[in-house]
Each structure stands twice: as C-alpha cells, then as structure tokens.
Amino acid sequence: MSGALLWPLLPLLLLLLSARDGVRAAQPQAPGYLIAAPSVFRAGVEEVISVTIFNSPREVTVQAQLVAQGEPVVQSQGAILDKGTIKLKVPTGLRGQALLKVWGRGWQAEEGPLFHNQTSVTVDGRGASVFIQTDKPVYRPQHRVLISIFTVSPNLRPVNEKLEAYILDPRGSRMIEWRHLKPFCCGITNMSFPLSDQPVLGEWFIFVEMQGHAYNKSFEVQKYVLPKFELLIDPPRYIQDLDACETGTVRARYTFGKPVAGALMINMTVNGVGYYSHEVGRPVLRTTKILGSRDFDICVRDMIPADVPEHFRGRVSIWAMVTSVDGSQQVAFDDSTPVQRQLVDIRYSKDTRKQFKPGLAYVGKVELSYPDGSPAEGVTVQIKAELTPKDNIYTSEVVSQRGLVGFEIPSIPTSAQHVWLETKVMALNGKPVGAQYLPSYLSLGSWYSPSQCYLQLQPPSHPLQVGEEAYFSVKSTCPCNFTLYYEVAARGNIVLSGQQPAHTTQQRSKRAAPALEKPIRLTHLSETEPPPAPEAEVDVCVTSLHLAVTPSMVPLGRLLVFYVRENGEGVADSLQFAVETFFENQVSVTYSANETQPGEVVDLRIRAARGSCVCVAAVDKSVYLLRSGFRLTPAQVFQELEDYDVSDSFGVSREDGPFWWAGLTAQRRRRSSVFPWPWGITKDSGFAFTETGLVVMTDRVSLNHRQDGGLYTDEAVPAFQPHTGSLVAVAPSRHPPRTEKRKRTFFPETWIWHCLNISDPSGEGTLSVKVPDSITSWVGEAVALSTSQGLGIAEPSLLKTFKPFFVDFMLPALIIRGEQVKIPLSVYNYMGTCAEVYMKLSVPKGIQFVGHPGKRHVTKKMCVAPGEAEPIWVVLSFSDLGLNNITAKALAYGDTNCCRDGRSSKHPEENHADRRVPIGVDHVRRSVMVEAEGVPRAYTYSAFFCPSERVHISTPNKYEFQYVQRPLRLTRFDVAVRAHNDARVALSSGPQDTAGMIEIVLGGHQNTRSWISTSKMGEPVASAHTAKILSWDEFRTFWISWRGGLIQVGHGPEPSNESVIVAWTLPRPPEVQFIGFSTGWGSMGEFRIWRKMEVDESYSEAFTLGVPHGAIPGSERATASIIGDVMGPTLNHLNNLLRLPFGCGEQNMIHFAPNVFVLKYLQKTQQLSPEVERETTDYLVQGYQRQLTYKRQDGSYSAFGERDASGSMWLTAFVLKSFAQARSFIFVDPRELAAAKSWIIQQQQADGSFLAVGRVLNKDIQGGIHGTVPLTAYVVVALLETGTASEEERGSTDKARHFLESAAPLAMDPYSCALTTYALTLLRSPAAPEALRKLRSLAIMRDGVTHWSLSNSWDVDKGTFLSFSDRVSQSVVSAEVEMTAYALLTYTLLGDVAAALPVVKWLSQQRNALGGFSSTQDTCVALQALAEYAILSYAGGINLTVSLASTNLDYQETFELHRTNQKVLQTAAIPSLPTGLFVSAKGDGCCLMQIDVTYNVPDPVAKPAFQLLVSLQEPEAQGRPPPMPASAAEGSRGDWPPADDDDPAADQHHQEYKVMLEVCTRWLHAGSSNMAVLEVPLLSGFRADIESLEQLLLDKHMGMKRYEVAGRRVLFYFDEIPSRCLTCVRFRALRECVVGRTSALPVSVYDYYEPAFEATRFYNVSTHSPLARELCAGPACNEVERAPARGPGWFPGESGPAVAPEEGAAIARCGCDHDCGAQGNPVCGSDGVVYASACRLREAACRQAAPLEPAPPSCCALEQRLPASSSSTYGDDLASVAPGPLQQDVKLNGAGLEVEDSDPEPEGEAEDRVTAGPRPPVSSGNLESSTQSASPFHRWGQTPAPQRHSGRVVGAHRPGLLSPVFVYSPAFQSGGEEGLWMSNTCTLR
C-alpha cells in the first residue's frame, strides 16, 4: 500500500500535546483520509467503497478506478463530506488480481490532487449464484427429470446471463449438454431430460456453469416398485445406557395417512463404525403384529460385540418388514442410532473469540451435545484458563442449560500474549464420570495496542431480525470521548457505513491482573509516546451503537468499529452477528381447500411481489423422506450467501472445533511442558479490518502494532483469497441429518411443475388444477424471482386427497384364456363408525364367476370396523380375448352393532336394496388383457404404389445431369424449378450424356438468358432474353414439349402460345428416352416433376389374406393401414419398430438410428414440427444414454459392454456413424466420438483392411471367405459419415480405399458387393462404376421391383423360413433387406431416382406393421436408405383416393390422402379372416398400404433350429388338503366349497409358493447360432425371483450376457448358442396371486438376426401339482385333464415337466467343467457339503442342476433335518418350515443361546426374542473349535467326507433378511452337550 500526502505535514506539537496516559483520545485535528474497500471484488457486482475524510471544511471529490492488466476497466466518483461511499460496477468476465486506485480533489485546486493511493484487490469471477432444483430426488428408468435453474446476484436479484448445463451419469459420461441457455424469465431457466429404459443406476449429476464457475446437484436413478404403504423406523436418538434397554417404534401408514394392519418382523444388531468397523454384533430377531405402529425394545447389551474397547463407536442397524393383511410387503432399514460410551461432545461456540483484550473481561461459550447432535442438559463441565501449564488464572465448574455453558474470565494480565482454555466433562446429571472423557482445548491470542486502548464489541443477546434496530454495546479501556466510525459488511460487500459520537453510558474500574515480567516490544508506534506503565486499576467505559437491520445483512453480517487517537493510532474491533433469514419477496402458496377427494378441481393460489416469475411444484408428501436436500430451501440460499463472506483465514483455528493431543493420557497432558500454541502472533487494529474482509488505504491512521510479527506482515497477509465457505460461519454438524441415514423405498410422482408470471397488482395468481386419483397428500411449494424484490421461497402447503371410504383391487396385467384368477378386493373404512358394506362386482360377458354360472355380477356383504381394512376374494374365469373391464362398487351403511344384530347375509342382494341412505360410496374399474393360448405369430402384406409420382431432384453446384426415365408416349412434361441461375434440362436417348442430346438452359448468363442447344455445352440454336426468370426463394413452373420435332419451352403449368419462351424445330423428332436435370457450376437447384403412369393413371391389385389351418380360434386379427409417405410407418412407431427385445448394445441402436433418419428427412423437406422434433430428440437422448452403457474403457463398444472380452469392430463402427449423424440434433460428446474413432484406427491392418475384432453377432456380415471386405467397407463408411479431420484419419480411409479397390473384383457375393459399392461411391473411387455394374448384374428384377438375394449362404430349405406350408407366410433373410438397402443408398447417392424406385417398392413390401423390418441392422440400414430416397423424391403434395374391399362382402373402406393428412396413419380393422382383398387407387402421388395379420398357433415350428428342453420343479405340498378322490370331484361343489375364497389367512398360506424353472437349449446346425434370445413366460400369477436371476450372471462359462424381465416374460441374451452342448438357465419364480387351471405356456428360443431360426416348447404344471388344484369350477373341479379342446390343431401342453430328463441326458451341459486349479479356500455349500473352493461349488451346482450357493461354515456343521411330516428340501425352502416343539421359555446353557417369550402379549400372539452367545465347547471330530472363542461359527476342516449331524429347525427364517436359523441338537456329538445352535449369518435365499 502506498500513498503520497500533498498537503503540509502537521507540526510535531500535535503529538506532544496528546496526553501520555491516553485520557484524551479525541478526534485528530489534522486533515486526512481512510478508505476501506472489500478485499475481494466480484465480477458483475456493484462494489461499495467507504471513504472517511478527517477534518475537511468542505466536500472532497473522490474518484475510484479499477485497473486490470494495466488498463482501467471501470471508474466512479462522488463528493464526500466527512464520510460517504462510492460504488463501482465490476464488469463480468473479469478475474484475477487488480489495482484499486483512488484520488481526492477539491480543497486547493491550484495545487492539484489532495491525495492519491492504490492497493491490490482480488477479482473473483463468481459474482452470481446458481440454484438447481429438480422435481424429485430419485427417478426410475424412463422417467423425465424436470429441472429449474435460478440465477441470482449476491443481493438475490435475477441475473440474466448465458448458462451452460450438462448431465453426467455415475460413470462420468456426459449424457446431454445445453449450450447458451438464456433465462426465459427473471433469471429462471427450465430444462428436462428423459431417462432411458436402461440407464446406469446410481447417482447422476446436473452441472451448470456460469461466469466460469460450476454448480452441481445430484439425483439418483434406481429401479423400484411402488408400494401401497410407507414403513418408517423411529429408533432412539442415541443409546443412553449400554446396559439398559431403549424403546424404538415402527410405523406403517398408507400414503393417505391411515394405519396399516399386518405382521411385523424386526432384525437388529450393532455394528462398529470408523476405526471399529470390523466389530460385528450379534443379531436379534423379533416377530409380532402391528396396527399403524409398534414399539419394540432395543437392548444393546444383547447385540454389541463382545469385549469392545472403552471408546467403541457403533450404530444400531435395524431391519423391519411389514406384511399387510392384503399380502403387500414393505421393508425399511435404519442405522441412525449411535452407540458409544462417551455421550457428550464439546465444542466452543462460533462466537467465542479466538483472541482476548488485556484489561477487558473475556467472555466465551461452550456447546455440549449428545451423539445425535441434540443439546446436552445437566452436564457439569470444568473450564480452566492457563498462561502456562503451571500458571492457572481461572477455574470454574458450570452446569449446562439447553446445551450451553457460558463463562467469563474477569481479567487477563495486560502483558499476557497467550491463554490456554481447557474444558472437561466432570459429571452427567450429578454423577461423576472420572477420567472417561477427554478434555477439549482452545488457544487464545492477545490483542495489542501501544496505548493499551482497546475496544470490545458485545454481540446482541439474540439473533437480529430485519426491520429492527440493533443495539451493540461497545466497551473501551480509554475514555469514551471519540467519534466512532463503523462499517457493516455482508455477503462480501459494504452494506452500511457511518459515524456517531461516543457517549459514555457506564463507567467502571477494575483491577488488572499482574503484569508479566517479560517486557513488551513495541512496533509501528511513534517514538513520541512510550508505553504506559502497568496500573492496578483499569477504567472501562461503555458506549453503544444503534443500527437499522436491513435485508442485505441476512444471514451474516460483520460489524467493524474504530476511532482515531490524537497521535494517529487507530483503535478498532470487529465481530460477526447473525440475522434471521428473511426474503424481501414474500411468497406464499396455498390450496383452496385443505382436503379434497381425488379427481376434484382445486385452486392453487400464489402470492408474490408483482412482476415476479413464480415456479410452482406439487409433489407427494413422501418425496421429502426420500433424500434430504433435494428441494430448494431458504437454508440453502442463505448458506450460499454466507459463502460470499470474505474473512481472515488467520482469525480462527485451523481445527474447526476442539482438539486434544492424540496418544497422550490425561495425566501426561497435564504435566507436559510442551504447550502447542497453534499461532505465535498477536492481533491489532489492522486485524479488525482484515477480519471484516476489508483492505485499507490511509495517510493518517496507524493500525498495525502487532508483537512477534514474524508471520503477520504486510507481505504475509495480502487481500485474502475467497473461500469456499465462511470459516467463522455456522459449521456443519458433525452428525449428519438423521433422514440421510434412512433408506426409503416409496417414490411417488410429480403432480405440478409450472412457471407463471404474477402480473396482477395485488400480487396474486391462481392455477386451477385437477387433483390426481391418488389417495395421498400433496405438498405445494413455490420459488419466485423479481427484479425489484429478488428471490423468495414459499413455505410448503399441504393438500390431502382422501376418501374416508373406498375400495381397491388389483388384477394381473395379463391372463390367458381359460385360466381362473383369485382376486382380492379390499374395503377401507376410515369414517369413524362401523360400516355394513355391500360389495357388487360386475363383469362383462367374457368373464364368469366361478361357482356362480351365468351371473354378470355378484354382491357380497361384509362388516368393516372403523379405521380398518377388510379383504374378500372372488374367483373369476376368463373366456373372451382382448381388454376386459371389471367394476367393483361398494355401498356402506352405518351400523353401530357391526352386524351383530342377527341380520341375514345369505341373500345380500335383498339387503342391498333397502331404503337406508349410504354413508359411503365408491366404485373402481380395472382392466385386464386376456390373450389366446399358443404362440403369437404375425405377417404383414405391404404395397407401395404410385398412380402418378412426383419426383424431387436436388442438384449440387457441379455440372452433372441426373437422369429420369421417360414413360412411354410422354412427349411433354412440366417441371417446377428453384435455383439461383443456370438450370439445365437434357433430352437424351440414354441415362447418360449422349452426342445427340438436346440441352435446354433456363436463366443462363447469371439469370439473364435462356436457350436451346443440340449438345451439352453446345452453341445456342435458339435463345431469348429472360431477366430474373429463376428464383431461389420460390419454385417456378415451366413446361417442355418435343412433339413432332418441335422443341418448345414455356412458363406456367399448361402450354400455350403466349407462354412460350424459346422454341426450335429439329429436322426429325428426337429420340428421348431419359430426361436429365442439372445446374451449372456455382449454382445449386431443385427440380420437381410428375412421372405419369401408363393407361388411365390408376392402380389396382387383388390379394388373399389367410391364416394357417391350425390357428387358435378367435386369435385372428387383421388391420389395414394407409399413409401417404414412405417414412410414415416409421414416424408413427419410432419407439417400437420391431417385435423383438432390445437388450444389447447393437439392438439398442434401433431406438437411436431411425430417429436420426426421420429427423433428417423432415428437416430437409421442411416438415419438422416442434412436437415431432421434441419426441424424436427425446428418443435420441434416451438411446444415447442407453448406448453409453455398452461402452468399454478403451472407447470401443460391444454387445454387452464390459461383460464381453473385447470391443466389437463392427458395433463400434455402427455406433460411431450413428452418433455422428445425431450431432445435428442432440448433444454428442466429441470425446466419445474421438475415443471410438481412435480405437477403430488402431485396429487397422497394414493392407488397409479391418479385421473382425470382438464378436460379430450377425454372421452374415462375415461374408464367408471375403469376411474382411464387407467389414472394411462398413468401417470406412462409418469413418466417412463421421468426418475425417486429422491426417491420421484421412490416411486410414485412403488405405481402406486401396484395399477395397483391390478386393472389389474378387467379391462375388451380393452382400459384400453391395457394401463395397456403397463405400467406393462414398469415397468417389474410380472403381465405383465397375462395382456398381457388378451389383446391378446380381440384382433380381421381377414384377416391377428390384432386390438382391443371398448366395453362398447356408443351404436352407424354404420351409425353414416358412411357418406353414399353406402359402400363409412371410420371411426374408434380414441380410437380403440389408444388402438391398445398401444398393438403394448407392442409387440415392448417385441421384438415380429411376433405378431407386423399384428397390423402394421391394423394401416397402418387406416392412412389418410397425415400420421396421425383421431385425435391428436391416431396419437401421433400410430406414436410412428410405429416408435418403424420400428426401430425394419429396414433392410436397399428394392427392389420392384409395379404396379397399373384401371378397367376404363384410368390409369396404375408402381412404382420402391429401397434403394435410399425408403423415397420418389411417387404420381400419378387417372383420374376418381368411378373406380376399381388392385395392384400387387413383390420383397424384404415392402411398404405402400395409395389412397386419396376427394369430396364435399351437406349435409353430415344423423344423426347429434349436433343441429345447423345459423342466418345472415344484416343492411337495406341506400342510395342504389331500388330493380329492374322483367321486368327490364329480359331486356338487357344496361337498367341498372353496371356503378360503374369503379367508385372508388361507390365501396367505396358499400364496407362499415358489417353483424352479430350468430351460436347456442347443443349436441344431453346425457350429453355433448368431446372438440368440431365450424367452421364458411365467405361469399366470407368478413373478421371477430377481436374486436367482442375478446368480446366473456370475457364471462366466454359460455365455449368458444379460437378462430382462418384461412383464411375465424373462428374456435371456446369449452371444451365441453352440451345438456341442446344452446351454441351460435355472431360476425361481414366486407366486403373487392365486391362478387356477393354468394354461400351457410357450418357451421359445430364436436367432435374433434371423428370427425364422427358432424353436418353441410348451410347459405347464403337472396333473398332481397343488397348483393344478387351487380353484374349482363346478362339476369339473380340479380336473385339468378334462379341459375342453381349444380348436383345430390345438394340443394342450404336457402336464409335468415338458420333456423327459433323458431327452437331453446324453449331451453335456455347457460350462460345467471349470478350470478351477488348486487355489481357493474351502467353501461351505448350501447343501451342507464342504467344497475345495468356490469354483468347485459352482461346478457341482452345474452338474447337479441344483441351486447351490456359498453358506456360512456353520451350515455345514449340522444336518438340518425337518420334522417328520416334511420332506427334505434345500435351504432356501426353510422359510416355510414350521418351527419344532422347542419354542419358548427355554434356556440352554450349553448353547449360549436363549429363546424367551416377551410377555405380556395378547392371546394368540407371540413376540420372540433370540439372543446369540458364544458357542459351546466341542472337542472331537474334524471340527475346528476353541472353548475360548466367542465366535458362534464352527467350520469343518478340509476332509474328504465331512461328518454330518442331525438336528431340528426351531427358528423360522424369512427371505431377504439377515436372520439366523436355529437348530436344536439333542446329541451334538459324543461327549458334546445338548444345545440350541445358530447359523450366525446364514442368509438362505
């Protein structure tokens, strides 16, 4: 800091006259200045500079200037008298170091400036804050993430600057990017992001960058199922006594707030954390009932690990599972309860100063908290102050109140430089704690003044509020006869500046502590005033300062006060003060009603400052429990504002909080001579300015007087750098919020997400919204931004949507015709009185009530107590196909007796008709899809026809003609032209330039002349002046005629003499077979012509639609669709182009690439609407997300990502070209493209070819002996379409071109030829014409269509592709579609429309009804080709009439196609099959007609391509009724009614059922298949067990890469299925609802790329299965064998296993022989056998086809023998085993375990507590054990045959919980003890 005084210096007499003892400290009489400014300026912020002028008789003009890199960037000035401020607006984009310069002028103008000075400041580029808000914290796949961004300045005003935003997935891949975002209103920006159906699960991040700073917010993507209720665990906040029991509570409530009734299971233990994380406690299991809530005991002594150290820290882990009365389950987990012996933590409060001032009392405060962060009451602490370890100056013991202890050290010696504070817990609630607690320390440094004059501000006693007047007490050790100057800084800027004279309000004297002997060294003090001698009495005067609290001071302000003594010494102090949060923009959001019923309309009322932009959201109340911090709160806003605070980093301890000396005992610490002072410096008045965040420039005031100033110098403390957070702000709690520790599983949806402007003068706005049908509570919130009032956040408002009486039921999504379903209906009564309910269930004709034949509705009576829910069950049978609606209506009547008055319920219909007024009514409708039996099949008849066709030709700016063939007898045509100039038309005898061609030029010579010449570029034979005849802005129409040798050219659509422009007569008529179009060099053009059909310009065709003879009756469906655009079907089915799954990296591209082609087509033809653009870009964004999940670390892609051994060359090229094409429409990270391109080039061979690195899933692309040729062509196409920017990339494509040019003549198969021709054409290779000639020679042309067929492929009988031999079939090898599409791409690239049209017609015939083709690759390539053709031929208009009629005379339909509906897919159902159809069309343009036929067949494959074996294993019935004799079945239903239909308990018993499915398959041709998909449908009412599916992925030898669960189907993906061995999958299925008479289901396997290669096999339950006897239907009860025939050709599936085991017994299973080697430790298997290693266990599981899993060693120590009534089973079935007789009130000392009943419980209820202890002594056999070990484990040594023992299970196990299984062993071993043994962590799945 430098300065220059230009006025005369004051005489030294002024200093000499000042009193030595400091009694007079008046304002200095000499003129001078002091300028204070923020040490950190911020870009875009108006910074305030405070100016103080001493003793000036008049105003001084002060100018301030900010200089960066030597150039002034901003300046300002103002007139100052005594004190004032100047404001500087810092430009945006500025950052780094800058100079702040100031000048003062005005006293003596003739002498120049009065003063000037300068100092360095830091300019921080962050001058605004960004707040990111999402609608939810957790999303499911396919959800849309809704994002709002609020940008504000430090004063909370909107900032309208450009933003950049992007989203990262958990792997760091950039999923989407928004550039140059601009707030749409008041600093608010809205965005949204669609998630794909298979995103990377985990934590995602939204990043927003503004002014060079990045802000982020995270959200999670998880898969979850919406439960019906919410489960919460409320444990104690902490464990007070480790030897006593605490109480916890489990709460289960429906989302609408009502309690859940059901069964509760609790499992808990104590686990160590941090250093003690290796300590694992013992589990305790409890079961009981629950109604809304249930208390339970937490006894830590039973769970805590044995012999834990004194300072152990852990947490109680609690799992709770509730099963409601309707069978719904929910699991919750909590580990938020700390367990530790030291219950109190000590912290010095944030306002406890780190320095003391001699002569003034030191006031401090200690905060005491319990482990959960709550205030600790009644804690006795001892506070000591020491100068040295042996020099104690203060000791006090205080008891805490509300967690606080205040203390005051009356006086500290004036010569003391340091004080050491020690705080220690002495007693809790009066009980001494001894040496159990470690003390906490704080080091205090001295403040120094040479005159011993000190100021001390006293903070207010309470947080300040905006609008009030703040009172600050100021103490001074010198007389209060001075002018007090003050500065208030907040958010890094000066917000208040002023002065006031000091008035003494209190005067007192106090005795100072003795001075230290060490003399005090003075620095920076005038020699005229030596230090005063120590005095016994110190006078202290007290004055006050009153300030108005403004919103700019929220939430944290810094107050600086100072005065100047006559000798120029500045005396100062500063403090920080808190202001309660306050928004100037007061925002509120309220509903018009607090409670409403679902479906009603409510008003959402918003109030904010007028002109505000308000964003409103309404989400389910449970969202707030998902993850803390997801919504924008005032706390987040004001915490961000605190970050603008700039304070001295030397002002606080490096440790944020107390510390102790690690490794030293308390005794050693007390005697230690080492005193660790963290700072060896004192503070002075200059530090007060620095602590406030200010820099000072002055010529009059001396501020720096520190002692021992080695560290604290001008050089050491420049303008301080900004911090990420305020070091003296409220420190974050060391205990995170409890909600963060809780894992929630209920994720509701968003209702409202909307922004609006408040324009009404009243500041109110209203949204009328319809309440969703959900019964729940909705929380409304609002955030507003205003230019005048700034940001505001509303308090949340609650709307409860609730019906006190309602009914609910669920149906399976899909049922097969003939099946019976047991449907639970639940009635909920929350009306406060008992209700007599009449439930009426109505069904349509195709659904029957089992046991009530012929009825369309059934009424049942029930009584429901208040606050409860009651279920009933109804059995339905389904016979009609399609979507069926079921309606339930419930009427409730008040009944105080709850049906105990004897009213009859035998005929509920009669009581239902009584005259009473119902107190509750509800009705619900649900839909269920009923499908036919068998396997669905489909084919599509397609026709693309053009009665007359408009052709669109685009010509580049080069002189090359594009030729179109002339229809016969056509001697005139009209053409619409758009061009700048030089449009040329050629009349030629061939499709190329010929010697005798006629050339017509329009707008030549820069659009001034037109002419006719008799050769290309020939001399004009006729010409005319035609200025501006052409235009690029519009199409202009011309006609051309050559009849009889007279060539005429005219303007307009119709020829006339007046319209002739130029004419010429030839000697003889020209031979015109082709018409060419071009533009000259330097001009581009577009031409539109009509190609006329022959004869009457109409189209007609007749064809037959049929189904196979064996089709399932009633399953036939046919739909006709017409659209006037070749891309139309694709436009209408962009998200579902194939009837195939999309589970790998290549198939996923079907969701991506077609959208690019469609967008390009619509954009090029100017048809892209905002709606279509939004939809297609959403698909692209989702496809991009999905594809990145298949990326490998080296930048390549493979079918299953990192699960594959290497990347795939073919797939990486496919992804590269697709991503490159998408760049025009969505964000594609250039790094992803560069990585893929680099990987590809690295694989190139020396000859320029690309080898097939990785697996090629579609073997057609290998092309036999020329396999490298098509792959090289494919890769070079990808590189060219991506673009070659570098020399390396261009060199790579050149090498590939040379390879293809040399290889093209040798490639004779059409696939290689088509790909090579397209690649050479793209490369503009001279070899391209010859390649095209060869390709044309291989074409198959018939019936006006052109295509290419496979050669050198498998010798496959046509029957392989045809499902039946009755000509009802459709199958073309997908490679043929692909190669034909490449030929079309070549034609469109050359502009050969005439050759392209027959190819388009053939491709259109191969399309499926969804707009795709047969597989992924052919669909993507064909759609790209069709899109390019559509761009080339687009004419803009259509006018067609299409008639369709059936020969059955039951169908006739006329479709009109015109410009307004040409992209609308018009459909009509064809009523009956088989039938003949006749189609006719007339008009202009082309259209695509498709007939989609679907049907079901019993066995679709005559010659299967795979062997397929299916096996269904069911557990034996346990506790079920014995099978009925046939006589009973033939009797009346009353003999054995389904009494459990209305019995919830019975249904629960039936529902706990699981089966094991095993499917094996192998390829029946040589070698192996392409990538294959195995589809396994599940029995109705069952769902797949995900855990068993996940186990399949662990077997690397199986070849299974992925599985998907799609509804009732499980799909398994294999990269190939070999022929040498059986590929098998085995998994479990769990029953969800009871279904009887289950239908046989088809398991199918097929080659993904050639779906005609397939096999299908049916399976069903066995005749004797309990599943076959669940439900009855009259006389045919349980007789599944008598199921009626389902129509011609139908054969029911085999009962029992679908195949005999010996059918595949001779063929080995793939992957059973593992290369295990000799490594690995012994592993206990779930079958009780010890295996040499985990590898050997997997090998045994494969060979035995058994679900063996690793188990704890204790599982191999005992044979778990079930009760005699049960058969042996695997461990995973133990959940259903009834406990043995040894249950309660038994203590077995030898076992170290106890089971006891926790009475009292209601009769019939038992809550069991099981406690684990050390294992008993075992001393024989091969058991490794120790009597001194406390571990409950015991394991076998590695022996050939482990010894087995018998026992009985006495403890139940529930799947999915970490719960023990208990085995009672009466005679464990000879010499052993009787005992109850526990498998400690045996989680049997």
Curated annotation (Swiss-Prot):
This chain is glycosylated at N117, N190, N267, N757, N1439
- Post-translational modification, as annotated: Proteolytically cleaved into 2 chains of about 70 and 130 kDa. The fragments are not connected by disulfide bonds.
All residue ranges annotated as the Kazal-like domain in the record? 1706-1757
Signal peptide boundaries: 1-25
UniProt-annotated stretches for the region Disordered? 1514-1548, 1793-1852
Tissue specificity here reads: Highly expressed in the kidney, brain and testis and to a lower extent in heart, liver and small intestine. Expressed in the lens, cornea and retina. Strongly expressed in the distal tips of the retinal neuroepithelium that form the iris and ciliary body.
SMART domains registered for this protein in UniProt: A2M, A2M_N_2, A2M_recep, KAZAL, Thiol-ester_cl
Q: How does it sit in the membrane?
A: Peripheral membrane protein
Q: What InterPro entries does this protein map onto? A: A-macroglobulin_rcpt-bd (IPR009048), A-macroglobulin_rcpt-bd_sf (IPR036595), A2M/Complement_sys (IPR050473), A2M_N_BRD (IPR011625), A2M_TED (IPR041813), Alpha-macroglob_thiol-ester_cl (IPR047565), Alpha-macroglobulin_TED (IPR011626), Ig-like_fold (IPR013783)
Q: Which Gene3D superfamilies match?
A: 1.50.10.20, 2.20.130.20, 2.60.120.1540, 2.60.40.1930, 2.60.40.1940, 3.30.60.30, 6.20.50.160, Alpha-macroglobulin, receptor-binding domain
Q: Which domain of life is it from?
A: Eukaryota
How does the record describe its quaternary structure?
Answer: Interacts with heparin.
**Protein name, per record:** C3 and PZP-like alpha-2-macroglobulin domain-containing protein 8
Provide the taxonomic classification. Answer: Eukaryota, Metazoa, Chordata, Craniata, Vertebrata
